[in-house]
A protein has these predicted regions:
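Conserved core of the PLP fold type I
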Residues: 145-280, 290-308, 379, 460, ...
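Conserved core segment of the aminotransferase class I/II
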Residues: 307-377
Length: 482
């Protein structure tokens, strides 16, 4: 059976897990996988098909939901095409809605899990140098709020956010207060925007490669994802995509981009805005890394250059202070803010008030900008330290790396013939994690790429992390020539 699946599997199909579901479902229907037979372990099938284990897990989960497979802890996964006998334990997966199964990719959850696993050195998590968090200033801010506004801190709050924080953001970033909506993290903002703006079948033009959380949110809304090569930033290509697909929106992360670390030049920013105005397409600008420059500030944001109210601006305190804050914000036309607030209140009536009020005080007192100055210097040092470690510990010619001027990430390309997903399996077994490039593409691509976060480990752990990664790369190259 496995050889039959291998022959029929086409790696250019999208989504890959859906293609695999179809092949396995057909094999069950034809009797090639009879009821009661065991399907290959997830890792084995992933290796044979040269795809990520996540893809196989997603396919198996969907087949479980359809009642065709059944997993047993410690025994494996089995075909159960025939009706299950009376007394069989109830299977909840068969009750999951089809729409939920569209978003079965667990890569984001895996990244967070790896970052909290004490056995792993995680170069995967997208987080700032949280050991530099301004603990004393934050403690003072929280104490002040609890002393002076305890009812506001612990009671219900407006869905749009605490007025104090909306005003502080409006003053610092130069936007009207009524245009600001507070979020429980920028990822919530992407989910809300997808729910608010995207109907099933709508096209969304986005960075390629681009933020995997955006890929997941727009795909879950039923969007057709169309990639624009953010590294080439060819404006003619973008115009062709706008003409051909008539997208509902453009999503871009133009400053210290996730995952590449690249920054869109000022001329390209103006040209993107011109095209958006010409074709009447709104832009979602993900600006979560814009404050994280090393030395020189980046070009003005699309929002700052926008003269036509086309840009929805998304930002976050989680990426510049700590992910545990779960605090982000949107700035947009008040009509969009009102609609998003209506959607937000159904799932999250308000973002925690205490954190909002504390951050508002940090901004007003100047502690927020002082923290930014500290981590800009720290991030520049850690980026240089990682580059130096790669030069020392990774075999020459095995890894080509970008050189960002801000943000959190190094975007790397493996030598020809090497697989980032296969390397990730080796790395996890050796105690180090990263993100394979396939997670950042809306189409089958990126298996030669990987993203490393240079701020997610302490400086004292950097050399060990890269040494382990370098050893895995060396082993993988030896396997190529064996």
């Amino acid at each position: 059976m496995l050889s039959s699946i291998e022959r029929q599997f086409v790696r250019t199909e999208r989504p890959l897990y859906g293609h695999l579901v179809t092949l396995l479902e057909n094999a069950i229907a034809r009797g090639e996988l009879p009821s009661g037979s065991r399907v290959p372990p997830e890792r084995t099938l992933a290796q044979r098909l040269r795809i990520s284990r996540t893809t196989v897990v997603s396919a198996y989960r969907e087949l479980e939901a359809r009642g065709l497979l059944r997993g047993y802890v410690g025994r494996g996964t089995f075909v159960c095409a025939a009706p299950e006998p009376e007394g069989t334990p109830f299977a909840w997966r068969g009750k999951i809605a089809a729409a939920a199964l569209r978003s079965s990719d667990s890569t984001l959850r895996d990244i967070v899990r790896h970052s909290s696993d004490a056995r792993l050195l995680s170069l995967a998590a997208g987080e700032p140098a949280i050991d530099k968090f301004p603990n004393e200033a934050f403690h003072e801010a929280v104490s002040h709020v609890l002393r002076t506004e305890p009812l506001a801190a612990w009671g219900h709050g407006p869905t749009e956010g605490q007025p104090a924080l909306r005003e502080a953001i409006a003053d610092r970033y130069g936007v009207p207060r009524e245009s600001v909506l507070i979020l429980s993290g920028a990822q919530q903002g992407l989910d809300l925007l997808a729910r608010c703006l995207v109907d099933p079948g709508d096209a969304v033009v986005m960075d390629r490669p681009g933020y995997l959380g955006a890929i997941q949110s727009f795909r879950a809304a039923g969007a057709k994802l169309v990639g624009w090569d953010i590294l080439r930033a060819d404006i003619d290509e973008l115009e062709d995509l706008l003409v051909r697909y008539r997208p509902k929106l453009i999503y871009t992360n133009p400053t210290f981009q996730n995952p590449t670390g690249s920054t869109l030049p000022i001329r390209a920013r103006r040209e993107v805005l011109t095209l958006a105005q010409r074709y009447r397409v709104p832009i979602v600008e993900d600006a979560t890394y814009g404050d994280l420059y090393f030395t020189d500030p980046p070009p003005p944001s699309l929002r700052e250059l926008d003269d036509h109210n086309l840009v929805i601006y998304l930002n976050s305190f989680s990426k510049v202070m700590a992910p545990g804050l779960r605090l982000g914000w949107i700035a947009a036309a008040p009509s969009i803010v009102d609609q998003i607030a209506i959607i937000k209140q159904r799932m999250d009536p308000h973002t925690p008030n205490l954190v909002q009020l504390a951050i508002a005080r940090l901004i007003r007192q100047g502690a927020f900008d002082a923290h930014l100055r500290t981590i800009r210097l720290e991030h520049a040092k850690r980026c240089a330290q990682m580059v130096s470690a790669i030069q020392r510990y990774v075999p020459r010619g095995s890894l080509r790396i970008g050189r960002p001027s801000g943000g959190l990430y190094l975007w790397c390309r493996l030598a020809p013939g090497m697989s980032a997903n296969a390397l990730l399996d080796r790395a996890l077994a050796s105690g180090v994690a990263f993100v394979a490039g396939t997670a950042f593409y809306p189409d089958p691509a990126g298996d030669s790429d990987l993203r490393l976060c240079f701020t997610s480990v302490l400086p004292s752990q950097m050399d060990e992390s890269i040494r382990k990664l370098g050893a895995c790369i060396a082993d993988a190259r030896l396997s190529q020539t064996a």
